[in-house]
Amino acid sequence: MTDIGKHNTEIEQDEMENLLRMDPVRSSLDVESRAIEPDNIAGESIVETRFTGGDSLDEPIRVTLFNEFRAIGEKLVYVLYPKNAQVLRDWDLWGPLIFSLVIALALALSTDKIERESVFTVVVALIWFGEAVCSLNIKLLGANISIFQSMCILGYSSFPLMIASIVCAFVPLIFIRIPVIVAMYAWTLFAAMGVLQNSNLSNKKLLAVYPLFLFYFSLAWIIFL
């Protein structure tokens, strides 16, 4: 019985040592106790490290804003001359957000004060919902770009319609509004075709273009009204 008791005691001690070894709190206490021993202090040095962040976390706000606006400008160049769709592969949604807010604000200012809040909300929701649906459709058709990349391209492509909304908000003459809207609508479609470049949709481009046509036509019609 004595041998069995000793054997059980040894097993319990081994299990306790394993549990203490697996306990991170206990391990850290052991490390600290070893660190203050004279031998360790004499032979080793402790170096503290700190995570300094990455990318723009350590940049001044002025530099970060400058880089963001420069990126928006580079993507706007693509809208003006849509030849290099690779520019928009590094996607962001700052430009689309600004354009949607400006379009909604221009349309809200051209309505009665009572309806401005509802018009602003509906237009912003319509723009983002339309971009999301068109991007999801393109992705489901087998495009090799992500949904957010597609939304980035479609959002930046709405820049001409933003110009049309500003013009129509301050120019009530219909013979000026119609040519401006038609030209900006065609420009928007031309720029939005960049979402289909190198996207592996050679046999399904019509299925991808049709929703884009309806979305931008609806937005252009709202601007005209």
Curated annotation (Swiss-Prot):
GO CC, alphabetical: endoplasmic reticulum; membrane; trans-Golgi network
Residues modified as Phosphoserine: S27, S28
GO terms under biological process: endoplasmic reticulum to Golgi vesicle-mediated transport; intracellular protein transport
Pfam families per record: Yip1
Keyword check for Chloroplast: no
Mode of membrane association: Multi-pass membrane protein
Places the protein is found: Membrane
This protein's UniProt keywords: Membrane, Phosphoprotein, Transmembrane, Transmembrane helix
InterPro entries: Yip1/4-like (IPR045231), Yip1_dom (IPR006977)
Transmembrane portions of the chain: 91-111, 118-138, 154-176, 180-199, 205-225
Any GO MF annotation of the entry: small GTPase binding
Task of the protein: May be involved in proper membrane localization of Rab GTPases.
Assembly with partners or alone: Interacts with the YIP1 family members yip1 and yip5, and with several Rab GTPases.
Family: Belongs to the YIP1 family.
PANTHER family xrefs: GOLGI MEMBRANE PROTEIN YIP1, PROTEIN YIPF6
Protein name per the record: Protein YIP4
Organism: Schizosaccharomyces pombe (strain 972 / ATCC 24843) (Fission yeast)
